[in-house]
Amino acid sequence: MNAQSQESPWASREHALHLLEEMLRIRCFEDRCAQLYGASKIRGFLHLYNGEEAVAVGVMQSLRPEDAIVATYREHGHAIARGIKMSRLTAELFGKVSGCCRGRGGSMHIFDAAARFYGGNAIVGGCLPLAIGLALAEKLQKPIWRSEERRVGKECRS
């Protein structure tokens, strides 16, 4: 650490603890999913997000609530960091109608329009056309990139 970084930290202690808590929530969820999958309680494919928790939590800090998200097939962490309830995710993994996709999406196709989380895709790279189409549709419907200040790093500024 240099003198400047000690004088003006990127995040307050409270904010850093909040980020750590979010990362731990994701890890605990994934660890429990791994246990349930190993016990054959979760069927189908299960692509875990272990070791990538900081990515999801960090990315969500730079997004606004109105920003849309299209994820890859390892999307549990992004969904949790976005605010989708773990109970709905768990129900989805169990194939229950109370899941965010009514039990039909499973692990690789989490979707929640209210959270502007437009799901993942089982094909590696398959999310790119979906994201581009979504961005184009939003651009044609309303101007989303205005001169207003983006939320990037807002909580971290000193």
Label each residue range with its predicted role:
Residues 31-35, 39-151:
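Cofactor-binding active-site loop characterized by glycine-rich and histidine/acidic residues
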Residues 1-55:
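Conserved acidic/glycine
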Residues 153-158:
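Positively charged, low-complexity/disordered segments
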